[in-house]
């Protein structure tokens, strides 16, 4: 079995939204379906995609392929939460993501919960402000996730060592 197949099997898929859309033509109405899917490996990689087709299953398949193409790696703290608080925006939607202590759980609504479950986050507090449109909320959540950075990546970017920028490691080194 190839690596692509193994990765494909490990991905979890969540159908976030399905819409029936209509195109009015001279002869009447043409119906089609629009689907939005979130895909993740529950280990720090997640993506979202949109697909349109005449049948729901075809739209879902197209959305899944689009989500796989748009997958991104998110740095997780102890493989359970995010490293720091962050805010994401998309249009009128605003999302605030806050790290949480172990055992807190996923406190998030709707489409944000689907993203965190697919991502593999176990402890997070998320608040949405403004628009509750599914597309805008997912876009704002991905904007916030793109802003996340681990102490290691920040240290590399600044040309320093991790213990020089991380408060906890600084305290441990200078005890």
Swiss-Prot record:
GO terms for cellular component: small ribosomal subunit. Residues 11-74 form the S5 DRBM domain. GO terms for molecular function: rRNA binding; structural constituent of ribosome. It comes from Rickettsia typhi (strain ATCC VR-144 / Wilmington). PANTHER family: MITOCHONDRIAL RIBOSOMAL PROTEIN S5. GO terms for biological process: translation. Belongs to the universal ribosomal protein uS5 family. With S4 and S12 plays an important role in translational accuracy. This is Small ribosomal subunit protein uS5. Part of the 30S ribosomal subunit. Contacts proteins S4 and S8. The N-terminal domain interacts with the head of the 30S subunit; the C-terminal domain interacts with the body and contacts protein S4. The interaction surface between S4 and S5 is involved in control of translational fidelity. Gene3D superfamilies: 3.30.160.20, 3.30.230.10.
């Amino acid at each position: 079995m190839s690596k692509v197949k193994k990765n494909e099997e490990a991905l979890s898929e969540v159908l976030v939204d399905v819409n029936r859309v209509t195109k009015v033509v001279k002869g009447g109405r043409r119906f089609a379906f629009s689907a939005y899917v979130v895909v993740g490996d529950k280990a720090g990689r997640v993506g979202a995609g949109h697909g349109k087709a005449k049948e729901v299953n075809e739209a879902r398949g197209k959305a899944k392929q689009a989500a796989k193409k748009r997958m991104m790696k998110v740095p997780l703290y102890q493989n359970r939460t995010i490293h720091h608080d962050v805010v994401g925006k998309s249009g009128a939607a605003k999302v605030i993501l806050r790290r949480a202590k172990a055992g807190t759980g996923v406190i998030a609504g709707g489409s944000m919960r689907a993203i965190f479950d697919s991502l593999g986050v176990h402890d997070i507090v998320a608040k949405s402000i403004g628009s509750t449109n599914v597309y805008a909320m997912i876009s704002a959540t991905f904007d916030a996730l793109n802003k996340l950075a681990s102490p290691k990546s920040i240290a590399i970017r600044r040309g320093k060592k991790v213990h020089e920028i991380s408060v906890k490691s600084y305290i441990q080194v200078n005890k």
